[in-house]
From Swiss-Prot:
Coiled-coil ranges from the UniProt annotation: none
Residue positions where Phosphoserine is found in the record: 522
Catalytic activity, as annotated: D-glucose(out) = D-glucose(in); D-fructose(out) = D-fructose(in); L-dehydroascorbate(out) = L-dehydroascorbate(in); D-galactose(in) = D-galactose(out)
Sequence ranges on the Extracellular membrane side: 32-97, 148-157, 208-216, 324-337, 389-401, 454-460
NCBIfam families: SP
Stated regulation of activity: D-glucose and maltose competitively inhibit fructose transport. D-glucose, D-fructose and maltose inhibit deoxyglucose transport.
GO MF, one example: galactose transmembrane transporter activity
Description of post-translational modifications: N-glycosylated; required for stability and retention at the cell surface of pancreatic beta cells.
Keywords: Cell membrane, Glycoprotein, Membrane, Phosphoprotein, Sugar transport, Transmembrane, Transmembrane helix, Transport
Glycosylation sites (chain numbering): 62
Protein name: Solute carrier family 2, facilitated glucose transporter member 2
SUPFAM superfamilies the UniProt entry points to: MFS general substrate transporter (SSF103473)
Length: 523
């Protein structure tokens, strides 16, 4: 049938949309590889002296034996005494943690507004408007070498985080609305695939002989402006979402025109009838507030389970690995930690592609549990490898293998699954609010990990992943006892299972919109 094929216009439009997802991934990974170079620059800007060991590390990473050049405005002051040096080193650590975590702050703030902006401006104009934030953030970071680097990088990553918070809802929504029903799940996962591809590209570009060195690290940080500019140009040729035009604006003529371009056919009657049914069913359900999600017995257990799934995803330690993998591999004794980090990114991308095939064949709950159990054992082996590294040099390979497997198990289940399951927990009325709250909680947990991981790692040393092993075990047990299977079940069946566990009465209305679930998927 015509609606089942991928037309040139559809492929072009999806590619254009996931350029935002690519930027999202690039911004996640770009701060990792040049960590030592940027910290070294922070120290010089702030006048904090380097001890011999750190100097050797920094200059080796920089690929030069010459200290970083500092502009006259930031000339290093006279040497500090030992107490002042120790205190200032903590300041540098704090500024670096803020440089990493400020990205999540921006995403946390903006995550509630992606849907609102898409409804207000339309999907295309909303993505165009969001790119102004991406370009601003890239400009701030690109200029950071020539000013107070710590302030400009923190500001730039905050603004970039705002952009990513917006598009984390906009892009999956837009792709889900333009995709044929039978292709919606597969095309929806391209958001996640583009994201992890962005992470991988940022890690490759961050190699010291490419851009991750003292001369070019600011270019590396500002490079996300390139896909932003490209997307701004290509969006001018993309059709608006037909569902937005028909359901929100009630412009049937424009909706048909958009559908004809996307489907490559003049007969779009089936799509129009589907949207008409969706509009009628949506109009019978009232929107649900955040407070109602917790006070209404019909929604309380599903939202608590949804939040726990997202907490499990973030508190598993995955972003600690993504943000700080280079330093983790250094601790593990890997001679070329940046290349090991790139290996993590490659495995991340490969298993994201694998999950596209698995998610529709195995149950959501089954995949999530499989991933969590695998991650639990990986954190144990990772920790054992780090603890015994001083006694057995080959333990570095144990830790590295455990990290690779950890990422693989994450992408099999805990990475993509929460977004599918949260959408399946709720009908059309409460779904937007529930998804917004879930996205917000995801960003909050992301921020906590980004801000605190370095301090926790410094405090616990090689034992840090034993902590995450305990956390993963708790969430695994919660999933086993509390999370229902949703594969192949209607909303009424899922809601009935929740009501059975909570002992609440059936809701007055439960509209089924299972065909639109995949459009809600995000990172």
């Amino acid at each position: 049938m015509s609606e089942d094929k991928i037309t040139g216009t559809l492929a072009f439009t999806v590619f254009t949309a996931v350029l935002s997802s690519f930027q999202f991934g690039y911004d996640i990974g770009v701060i990792n590889a040049p960590q030592e170079v940027i910290i070294s620059h922070y120290r010089h800007v702030l006048g904090v002296p380097l001890d011999d060991r750190k100097a050797a590390i920094n200059y080796d990473v920089n690929g030069t034996d010459t200290p970083l050049t500092v502009t006259p405005a930031y000339t290093t002051p006279a040497p500090w005494d030992e107490e002042e040096t120790e205190g200032s080193a903590h300041i540098v650590t704090m500024l670096w943690s803020l440089s990493v975590s400020s990205f999540a702050v921006g995403g946390m703030v903006a995550s509630f507004f992606g849907g609102w902006l898409g409804d207000k401006l339309g999907r295309i104009k909303a993505m165009l408007a969001a790119n102004s934030l991406s370009l601003t953030g890239a400009l701030l970071m690109g200029c950071s070498k020539f000013g107070p680097a710590h302030a400009l990088i923190i500001a730039g990553r905050s603004v970039s985080g705002l952009y990513c918070g917006l598009i984390s809802g906009l892009v999956p929504m837009y792709i889900g609305e333009i995709a044929p029903t039978t292709l919606r799940g597969a095309l929806g996962t391209l958001h996640q695939l583009a994201l992890v591809t962005g992470i991988l590209i940022s890690q490759i570009a961050g190699l010291s002989f490419i851009l991750g060195n003292q001369d070019h690290w600011h270019i590396l940080l500002g490079l996300s402006a390139v896909p932003a500019l490209l997307q701004c140009l290509l969006l001018l040729f993309c059709p608006e979402s037909p569902r937005y035009l028909y359901i929100k604006l009630e412009e049937e003529v424009r909706a048909k025109k958009s559908l004809k371009r996307l489907r490559g056919t003049e007969d779009v009657t089936k799509d129009i009838n589907e949207m008409k049914k969706e509009k009628e069913e949506a109009s019978t359900e009232q929107k649900v507030s955040v407070i109602q999600l917790f006070t209404d017995a019909n929604y309380r257990q599903p939202i608590l389970v949804a939040l726990m799934l997202h907490m499990a995803q973030q508190f598993s330690g995955i972003n600690g690995i993504f943000y700080y993998s280079t330093s983790i591999f250094q601790t593990a004794g890997i001679s070329q930690p940046v290349y090991a980090t790139i290996g993590v990114g490659a495995i991340n991308m490969i298993f994201t592609a694998v999950s596209v095939l698995l998610v529709e064949k195995a149950g959501r709950r089954t995949l999530f549990l499989t991933g969590m159990i695998g991650m639990f054992f990986c954190t144990i082996f990772m920790s054992v490898g780090l603890v015994l590294l001083d006694k057995f040099a080959w333990m570095s390979y144990v830790s590295m293998t455990a990290i690779f497997l950890f990422v693989s198990f994450f992408e099999i289940g805990p990475g993509p699954i929460p977004w599918f399951m949260v959408a399946e927990f709720f009908s059309q009325g409460p779904r937007p609010t529930a998804l917004a709250l879930a996205a917000f909680s995801n960003w909050v947990c992301n921020f906590v990990i980004a801000l605190c991981f370095q301090y926790i790692a410094d405090f616990l040393g090689p034992y840090v992943f034993f902590l995450f092993a305990g956390v993963v075990l708790v969430f695994t047990l919660f999933t086993f006892f509390k999370v229902p299977e949703t594969k192949g079940k209607s909303f009424e069946e899922i809601a009935a299972e929740f009501r059975k566990k909570s002992g609440s009465a059936p809701p007055r209305k439960a509209a089924v919109q299972m065909e639109f679930l995949a459009s809600s998927e995000s990172v």
